[in-house]
Swiss-Prot record:
The gene is glmU. Transmembrane segments: none annotated. Catalyzes the last two sequential reactions in the de novo biosynthetic pathway for UDP-N-acetylglucosamine (UDP-GlcNAc). The C-terminal domain catalyzes the transfer of acetyl group from acetyl coenzyme A to glucosamine-1-phosphate (GlcN-1-P) to produce N-acetylglucosamine-1-phosphate (GlcNAc-1-P), which is converted into UDP-GlcNAc by the transfer of uridine 5-monophosphate (from uridine 5-triphosphate), a reaction catalyzed by the N-terminal domain. Residues 1-226 are annotated as: Pyrophosphorylase. InterPro entries: Bifunctional_GlmU, GlmU-like, GlmU_C_LbH, Hexapep, MobA-like_NTP_Trfase, Nucleotide-diphossugar_trans, Trimer_LpxA-like_sf. One of its GO terms (biological process) is UDP-N-acetylglucosamine biosynthetic process. CDD domains: GT2_GlmU_N_bac (cd02540), LbH_GlmU_C (cd03353). This is Bifunctional protein GlmU. Its EC number is 2.7.7.23, 2.3.1.157. Binds 1 Mg(2+) ion per subunit. Keywords: Acyltransferase, Cell shape, Cell wall biogenesis/degradation, Cytoplasm, Magnesium, Metal-binding, Multifunctional enzyme, Nucleotidyltransferase, Peptidoglycan synthesis, Repeat, Transferase. It catalyses: alpha-D-glucosamine 1-phosphate + acetyl-CoA = N-acetyl-alpha-D-glucosamine 1-phosphate + CoA + H(+); N-acetyl-alpha-D-glucosamine 1-phosphate + UTP + H(+) = UDP-N-acetyl-alpha-D-glucosamine + diphosphate. The active site is at 359 (proton acceptor). Residues 248-452 are annotated as: N-acetyltransferase.
Length: 452
């Protein structure tokens, strides 16, 4: 049997935030959600989260995940004290206890499995993850014998100068035999510089303690402040981008771009500098994104390009060109072979194939037919101050520059709207609609003004 306990009670004072530390976000997910994700495939018998500071907020943040149990730690007196709170909760439990930190979000599922497997194959009372760090400051040091059995772990603040030179560190990830641990947990001491109960003090009291040294120390990077949060974001982005580059995606300047774990890319996609993808983005083959794009929860068809633009919660077809400086807002669908040009905003609209909206337009709550040409400066006036109204434009129609279509309105097929028109009534197929004042010219007007 397996129980998982996640330590999530701390305040995170160094974060300088109103949120508990485990609710800080890393690439769209909280630190706690990331830890839970890393162990979701273990199918544990018990999943326990030890909460304390702002416990209600922490509970609410994961209420969409079933099967979680919460254990309160008040006050917070160290990792050993946190795990002591499990003694009544796990009474009668026979099996292994995996202890994870809520502020170590980059741990891979494979690494956790490897630790559990080593723990069980070695029949140890406790197994820990260890890592060699070039700068081990802040981490407890692991001291083991020639057989790889741990003799002791000394917290950084309690190390002598000689002990501090050891760069084999405790990653803070443990797998215990619960029966062995529960017998000694009540007896750990707070005789240390922090007057806290350290979980590491149980190591020397257990008959057999082993460690698994991991190759990628970045996996066990802990987060205590915003600098470390930014560093973990960088590590996560490197991990994601390395994976997709192996699948054929080109990043021109990877360090300037960010993507989410939900993103999916086809072959021969190119991502230019300063391009950021959030949420679930599906990008088909041969797309060219950027530079300077923000794309969120979007589907982009093959051979499409987006430059200097924002796309949110929208679908874009094949062979579509967007930008520069376009804003594609939610619930927009742009079909194949369309062109959306500079300073165009589209919201909650359907743009049929082969249509062009090239310059300086606002299209909202609209249905645009096939092969429509929207002239520069055309807008759909969709809001009457209370409600939004729909504009429908039939296939093969075109609007002249600086036109206003006052919704609700239906423009038929093969219609031409004269430049500068404000159209407020439906227009039938094959018509020309003009709604503007007659031009008046006053000869010699300038001379009269000057009195000559």
């Amino acid at each position: 049997m397996l129980a998982i306990a996640i330590l999530a009670a701390g305040k995170g004072t160094r974060m300088q935030s109103t949120l508990p530390k485990v609710l800080q976000e890393l690439s769209g997910l909280t630190l706690l959600e990331r830890v839970l994700t890393s162990c979701k495939d273990l199918t544990p018998d018990r999943s326990l989260i030890i909460v304390g500071h702002e416990s209600n907020k922490v509970k609410e943040s994961v209420n969409h995940i079933s099967g979680l149990e919460f254990v309160n730690q008040q006050p917070q007196r160290g990792t050993g004290h946190a795990v002591q709170q499990l003694i009544p909760v796990l009474k009668g439990f026979k099996g292994d206890l995996l202890v994870l930190n809520g502020d170590v979000p980059l741990l891979k599922a494979k690494t956790i499995n490897d630790l559990i497997n080593k723990h069980r194959s070695s029949k140890a009372n406790v197994s820990i993850l260890s890592a060699r760090l070039s700068n081990p400051s802040g981490y407890g040091r692991v001291f083991s014998n020639e057989h790889g059995h741990i003799e002791k772990i000394i917290e950084d603040r309690d190390c002598t100068k000689l002990e501090a030179k050891n760069n084999l560190t405790n990653a803070g990830i443990y797998c215990f035999d619960w029966e062995s641990l529960s017998k000694i947990l009540p007896y750990i001491s707070n005789k240390n510089n922090q007057n806290e109960l350290y979980l590491t003090d149980t190591i020397q009291k257990l008959p057999l303690a082993v460690h698994l040294e991991i190759e990628d120390a970045g996996e066990v990077s802990g987060i205590n402040d915003k600098r470390q949060l930014a560093k973990c974001e960088q590590l996560l982005q490197e991990r994601l981008q390395d994976f997709w580059m192996e699948q054929g995606v080109t990043f021109i300047n990877p360090s300037s771009c960010t993507i989410s774990e939900q993103c999916e890319f086809g072959k021969d996609v190119t991502i230019e500098p300063e391009t950021h993808l959030r949420g679930k983005c599906i990008i088909a083959n041969n797309c060219h994104l950027g530079p300077n794009c923000f794309i969120s929860n979007a589907v982009i068809g093959k051979n499409s390009s987006i430059i200097y633009s924002v796309v949110k919660n929208a679908q874009i077809g094949d062979n579509v060109k967007v930008g520069p400086f376009a804003n594609i807002r939610p619930d927009t669908m742009i079909q194949n072979n369309c062109k959306i040009g500079n300073f165009v905003e589209i919201k909650k609209s359907y743009i049929s194939e082969d249509s062009k909206i090239n310059h300086l337009s606002y299209i909202g709550d609209s249905e645009i037919g096939k092969d429509v040409n929207i002239g520069a400066g055309t807008i759909t006036a969709n809001y009457d101050g209370t409600n939004k109204h729909k504009t429908i434009i039939g296939a093969h129609s075109k609007t002249g520059a600086n036109s206003v279509l006052i919704a609700p309105i239906v423009i038929g097929e093969n219609v031409t709207i004269g430049a500068g028109s404000a159209i407020s009534k439906d227009v039938s197929d094959n018509s020309l609609a003009i709604a503007r004042s007659k031009q008046s010219i006053k000869d010699n007007w300038s001379k009269k003004l000057k009195g000559t």
